[in-house]
Amino acid sequence: MITKKPTQGSQEQTAHAASKRMKKLSEYGKQLQEKQKVKNMYGVLEKQFRRFYKIAAKSQEAAGERLLSLLERRLDNTVYRLKLTISRAQARQIIVHGHVLVNGKKVYSPSFLVSINDEISLAPNVVSKTEFLERVVDKRLNIGVKVPEWLELNKKDRKGRVLRLPVRSDIQVPIEEHLIVELYSK
């Protein structure tokens, strides 16, 4: 009777397969991953994210929902949601350069929080640049991306208005905000 000896290659395969297995993520790892996902999505650095969390934690409503509402209300996010730019980074850039007006006044801070009935528009010098409008604004307006219910967009004038404050149901991205709250409440 012939018995087969395990070959050197089969031992290498099992050792290699073991290193490829995913390790189970710890609870802290899940919380950190969720926080990083939200920070990256909104383009916010840690210091400002923590500041928003402190504001959210002091409010009467659920801290996680309030945090997301505050992040949604940032001017750079609002300009992006109104489809006036292709990305939040581009929205941040045109805000810093003074190309966005809130209630007729230039605002240079992307972290500016919009309020109910605020009117957001592009500055006249941007509106006169048809290349930007054709390449960015009109293209985005025509691809069928919907403006959230908490905002109103006048496509003709390229102006938006805040109808109400955003709520959790307005955010379509799957976010487990309770993990972020657990992380910061330690």
Give residue ranges: language-model regions.
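Ferredoxin-like alpha/beta domains used as RNA- or RNAP-binding modules
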Residues: 1-82, 109-186
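Short, surface-exposed recognition loops or helix-turn segments adjacent to catalytic cores
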Residues: 89-93, 105-110
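Short, well-ordered loop/turn sites that connect or cap secondary structure elements
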Residues: 85-88, 94-95, 114
